[in-house]
Amino acid sequence: EGKWGGEVKDRPILFSGPMVRAIREGRKTQTRRLIKFEWSGSREALMHQATFDPAYKCPYGKPGDRLWVRETWGLMANHDVTDWFRDSIVGIPESELRELYLVEHAANWRIPSESAYWRPSIHMPRWASRITLEIVSLRVEKLQNISNEDCWNEGMCDATNPERKANRKWFSELWESINGLGSWDLNPWV
């Protein structure tokens, strides 16, 4: 049982490379996701659903549940092969061996024929995930109601903006890079 009550559940969630880096650097502590309504046919039901009654169930869980992050990943060798390789042939110190994740290397390093190694985030199994996040709160709002502080909590990094002035333009560009051109202007519920 979780500290918020009820059984704790783990669910997967996809993040892009830049957002995984922001999570690992401690810059991203919030995420906004489109609300996908399942409308029923009656007028009363539509009115009820439009008021965002607390009965709306978030598909990612409730406070206390965990989200395991799916990111682009690759299996270079299993531990048996790594141990044999290290001990028998090369003698590489343990401190120099580590797992590889594309998000850390995308900017300055490539494996030859990388398509043979890297797998899309959607196919990442639970055991390969290195980041688990806990849901601490949920809220529903219109996308463009994002506050200045929330822009930063979405992972904004701008060294030219040391006063942390809001940059809604940055967030709107991030949103459209994920959800398509014009998606910011639609101002959906998130």
Regions found by a protein language model. Give the residues of each.
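Secondary-structure transition motif
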Residues: 1-190
